Amino acid sequence: MLFRSEDIGLADPRAQSMALEAWDIYERLGSPEGELAFAQLVLYLASTAKSNAGYAAFNQAKADVRESGTEEVPLHLRNAATKLMKELGYGAEYQYDHDAEGGIALDQTGFPDAMGERVYYNPVPRGLEIKLKEKLDRLRAEREAARAAKGR
């Protein structure tokens, strides 16, 4: 599982399910039959696309949290459960992603104001990450245009 998560990552997300399935098969059948599931998994993992971009992104995000410490949650993301919270601006201008065109509120950020916007995940040109990069590049361009249209 560690090899799958760190070394293959989102280049081939199916590999994680396959690793869990091989483990489950071995647990159910034992040796020697269950070993065949691991053998097939090893062959698959050895021959599939590799990427540690997700792993690197996770580590960078953790490093930023360690460095910056606890930051304030942006007001628009705070739950306005009481009248006082509403008066303080909690939840103001919050955009529900599910209601936005395309399912993503493009001009909304989830980062604390003190941190500013960050990009952690930079997909590599291998496996499924090729498509993920195309999608993220498109979303980032659309986000920039949406923010420019609102003067942000």
Model-predicted segments: where are they?
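Short, well-ordered alpha-helical segments
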Residues: 12-16
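Hydrophobic "lid/gating" helix adjacent to the active-site nucleophile
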Residues: 5-8
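Conserved catalytic/coupling modules of large nucleotide/cofactor-utilizing molecular machines
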Residues: 17-152
